[in-house]
């Protein structure tokens, strides 16, 4: 069995599943496996009762696992984001592809920049009483949910306080 990088009880981020708790490592042979192998057993926070098995020998899938940020790590990310902006991609198809690729990478810095970009666009549309296109709104909500879930655990604050923390940390800039 490979030495695990993550230990039972540790919170990790796993791709689109967001925050998961490492339930342990289990040696097992699934129907499509030629032989038994070691799997990380993950419990997604957003889907109680679900279990995810990540083969420890699959570098691509294990590469999608990363430890939850701590407060110092989050503050470092916020410092790098402060004062930066992402330009609004005007082409709807290109924007959809770019934003979805960005969400798939789960890079907090990129996600915060994307949120700021979407928020700025939403504010600019409110004056002529227009709204964000549905796909942009959906991406915004997905991004907010993922970041709130992670940052709430990292900061040990209720999810509803994350927005205010980010707003203050970015000197009043909407994140």
PLM region descriptions:
Residues 29-39:
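Short, solvent-exposed secondary-structure boundary/capping segments
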Residues 57-175:
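Charge/polar-rich, low-complexity and marginally structured segments
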Residues 41-57:
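A short macromolecule-binding patch
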Residues 20-22:
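Conserved hydrophobic positions within beta-strands
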């Amino acid at each position: 069995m490979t030495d695990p990088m993550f230990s039972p009880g540790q919170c990790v981020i796993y791709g689109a599943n967001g925050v998961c708790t490492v339930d342990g490592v289990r040696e097992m042979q699934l129907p499509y496996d030629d032989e038994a192998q070691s799997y990380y057993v993950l419990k997604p926070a957003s889907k109680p009762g679900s279990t995810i098995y990540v083969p420890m020998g699959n570098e691509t899938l294990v590469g999608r696992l990363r430890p939850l940020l701590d407060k110092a790590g989050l503050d470092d990310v916020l410092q790098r984001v402060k004062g930066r902006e992402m330009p609004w991609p005007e082409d709807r198809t290109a924007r959809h592809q770019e934003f979805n690729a960005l969400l798939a990478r789960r890079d907090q810095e990129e996600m915060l920049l994307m949120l700021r970009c979407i928020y700025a666009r939403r504010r600019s549309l409110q004056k002529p009483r227009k709204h964000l296109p549905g796909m942009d709104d959906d991406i915004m909500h997905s991004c907010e949910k993922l970041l709130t879930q992670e940052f709430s655990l990292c900061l040990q604050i209720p999810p509803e306080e994350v927005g205010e923390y980010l707003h203050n940390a970015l000197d009043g800039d909407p994140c």
